[in-house]
Amino acid sequence: MLGATPAAAGVAEHVTEPVAYDAILLAGFGGPEGQDDVIPFLRNVTRGRGILDERLEEVAQHYRHFGGVSPINDQNRALKAALEAELASRGIDLPVLWGNRNWDPYLADALTEADQRGFTKLIAVATSAYSSYSSCRQYREDFARALRETGLEGRIQIDKVRQFFDHPGFVEPFIEGVKNAVEELRERAPEIHPATGVRILFSTHSIPSTDAGKSGPSGRPDSGEPWGEGGAYAAQHLAVAEIVSHEATGGTIGWDLVYQSRSGPPSMPWLEPDINDRIAELPELGVKAIIIVPLGFVSDHMEVLWDLDTEAMESSEENGLLAVRVPTPGTHAKYVKGLVDLVLERRDGLPVAQRPSLTTLGPWYDVCRPGCCENVRLGFKPAVAGLTP
């Protein structure tokens, strides 16, 4: 397996032998930090697709609305500091390096720093919880590309923590947020009965339907049965939404999984329904208020600020709905602790039976399965921390 440690280079789904990692690689998406950065950043995001700058400028307006600055970099700086503080509080000597896929500091910068400091074994934590090409395999491909670009293949090995969609550290902040949102609605509109007048909308990034169908391995880990519509990506979100709904409301408030931030030509099918379309349908069902849960996101980055806090809130107002948006995990203490626990899980080779997961789909694989999360348009490229292809 390209670029992985020997412990992760076998065919086992989970690694249960200790690995002496030298550092943590916090792998982010990246974002512009000024107006002049916006178009170059979007060129990086869309590299290889042949998208003209005129089309990129349409998306750029979302960033320009906020001064050309994406909040994601400051959020990752805060997460890096929170991880370092959590590690220090436990007496764990693991430096945290930070590198992005699409903007400074790049993954190649982090690998160069690792080499300069004599680090040879890195455990990566990507800022994405679910299984799909863009949220898992593309990170692994970018690790491989950065190793090639820096000439560090064979000198630095990179493993990656499992997808943590159903880890308590990721899920519990959402449960807490929904509970708080229900209370907020009770205070703001006591006349609205939660069971009949409130709807929870769990929102995540839409992806092409063909890519969704290729997300995850070929069958469900809990039953071996084929995935339904939307593949592992949709199934993971549905499973987590069910847990959050049950734990936060006892299942008394209805909910939907909705999608946002789609791009690409209208002729290409993407996962639906769009959150704004669903919002427009709710008044006819007697819904008076909604709770928006950004279930697919780890921090309040541009897709949350624009697509939810701007567009979805405008849709809610246009349709006469009271709306509350739940926070993302961000630097919530449970989330930060959970990420460190995931690192230690791999460092110590924790037995699978001792690994926490809140759905029957987990704990997810340490080593990605062959053919996992194919990009149908681009095909397979070299990737670390998973089996070929």
UniProtKB/Swiss-Prot annotation:
Please provide the record's keywords in A-Z order.
Cytoplasm, Heme biosynthesis, Iron, Lyase, Metal-binding, Porphyrin biosynthesis
Domain of life, source organism: Bacteria
Q: Which residues bind Fe-coproporphyrin III?
A: S70, Y139
Kindly provide the name given to this protein in its UniProt entry.
Coproporphyrin III ferrochelatase
Q: Where does Fe(2+) bind?
A: H205, E303
Family recorded in the similarity comment: Belongs to the ferrochelatase family.
Q: Which GO terms describe its molecular function?
A: ferrochelatase activity; metal ion binding
Q: In which pathway does it act?
A: Porphyrin-containing compound metabolism; protoheme biosynthesis
Q: List the signal peptide residues.
A: none
UniProt-listed GO biological process terms: heme biosynthetic process
Entry-linked HAMAP family: Ferrochelatase (MF_00323)
Q: What is the annotated role of this protein in its UniProt record? A: Involved in coproporphyrin-dependent heme b biosynthesis. Catalyzes the insertion of ferrous iron into coproporphyrin III to form Fe-coproporphyrin III.
Which Pfam families is this protein grouped with?
A: Ferrochelatase
**What is this protein's gene name?**
cpfC
**Catalyzes what?**
Fe-coproporphyrin III + 2 H(+) = coproporphyrin III + Fe(2+)
Q: What is the lineage of its organism?
A: Bacteria, Bacillati, Actinomycetota, Actinomycetes, Micrococcales
The answer to whether UniProt assigns keyword Lipid biosynthesis to this entry is: no
EC numbers, comma separated: 4.99.1.9
Give the span(s) annotated as Disordered: 207-229
Q: Name one GO cellular component term.
A: cytoplasm
Location comes to: Cytoplasm
